[in-house]
Each structure stands twice: as structure tokens, then as C-alpha cells.
């Protein structure tokens, strides 16, 4: 009886364990790279060197630059930022800050990270570098220091600008971020 139970367990264990393995997901992205974070081993990829628009991934670098400026003592989380008309008029996702108000760096960072706020990204850029384009230059300097050789930022939001090149990057460069 014990042998029959053991054989039954072995057979059912094999059947049920196979049923628990899901099919791999379909990925519609034209370019992607999946790595093991600890070993940096590539698990799967598709066109990882293809340059693509970054969109809101740009805000990771925006937040990184702001955090570094705080750590270097150039600004503090309590530093107040005047909101310009240009930032107030930003399209896309926003934290809905009003022109002429003052908002702390801390609150703007939350707006960038939690709400993907283009208005907050704009305000931080203006405070730190004087303009969005000057902040993009600063972002590109950081990208170069991080070894992101295929990266080009044109603004702190990731929004496309018809007058400028698109913020672009390759999936393999993003591993550095």
C-alpha cells in the first residue's frame, strides 16, 4: 500500500508541477532587455541596441540628478521653487501645480516620481539649471559619467519636442540606470 501511495504521489507531483509553469508573456515592445539584476546575465532580449524614445523613463534621470544635487548640498529638500508659466502649461501627466506658487523640492520630487509630473520635472530643471535645455545638458553629463553611451536627453520630461531630437536610448544602456 505504501508503494502504491508513493507511486501515486510521484506521478501527481510531476503532473501538477508542469501545470503550474505559466506560458511566457508576449512582449509587444520593439526593443527590450531582461537581465538578472545580481549577475547581470541576459535572460532574453530583442533589439537591445535599437534607439527608442524614453518617455517617462527620462524622469528617473531627472530624479537622480536632483537627488545628487541635494546630496552635494547645492539645494535641500526644503528649498522652495517658483512655478513658471512654462511649467504650469506642461502637457501630459502633471501634479497640477499653479503658476506663481512656491513648491518645495521634496514635493516636486514626489510629483515626478509618483505622478510622473511633467510640470514638476520642468520646475526642478528650471531651479537647478535655469532652463530645461540646460538641465538636459546636465542630464547628459551624468549619463556620460554612468557610461550610458547611447543616451541623449533633450528635456527633463521625456516629452517629444518637434524642435529637438527625441530623448532616446537603447535598452542595453538602460541597464546602467
Predicted regions and their residues:
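Active-site-adjacent loops and short helices of periplasmic peptidoglycan-processing enzymes
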Residues: 18-165
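Residue-level marker of positions within ordered structural domains that often coincide
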Residues: 5, 67, 117, 172-173
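Acidic, Ala/Val/Gly-enriched low-complexity intrinsically disordered segments
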Residues: 175-177
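Conserved small/polar residues in nucleotide/adenosyl-binding loops
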Residues: 166-171
